[in-house]
Amino acid sequence: TELYQFPKQSFDYVVLSQTLQAFYQPDKVLRELLRIGKSVIVSIPNFGYWKVRTSLLFFGKMPVTKTLPNTWFNTPNLHMCTIKDLFNYCESQNIAIKKVIGVNEDKISLIKKSNLEMKNLFSKLGVFLIG
């Protein structure tokens, strides 16, 4: 990434929308975003969504959905993850999780550690406010 050119805390908010999974080193991208922004908003397609899991389980192939619209051979995605994966990553790296919401169709819901399992299963997208 070319984020090195920005000084520390250059921005109040930095937004990365549904592209974290397309980087070769998403952990480094997150670190740089946290360096240049006071807060970071990251959204990810949730590979733990029940329809994605069902497609793999019953059909034995990578799913194609609205949030994952490409087939396996033409996808830009390199590092698919779930809401739970990113939540756990942030905790393991001592990254402050300010708020997490799950998005599904026309509903949004707050995700906390206490409901993480269910929200990971039933949310198409995860949106994290970290910093």
Task: Give the predicted meaning of each segment.
Residues P7-Q9, L121-F122:
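Flexible, charged surface loops at secondary-structure boundaries
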Residues E2, Q21, Y49:
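Active-site micro-motifs of SAM-dependent methyltransferase domains
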Residues K28-E32, S39-G131:
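S-adenosyl-L-methionine-dependent methyltransferase catalytic module, highlighting the catalytic core
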Residues D12-Q25, I44:
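A short SAM/SAH-binding and catalytic strip from SAM-dependent methyltransferases
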Residues T1-E2, F11-Q18, I101:
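Generic detector of solvent-exposed, compositionally biased contiguous segments
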Residues E2-K8, Y24:
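Short conserved loop adjoining the S-adenosyl-L-methionine
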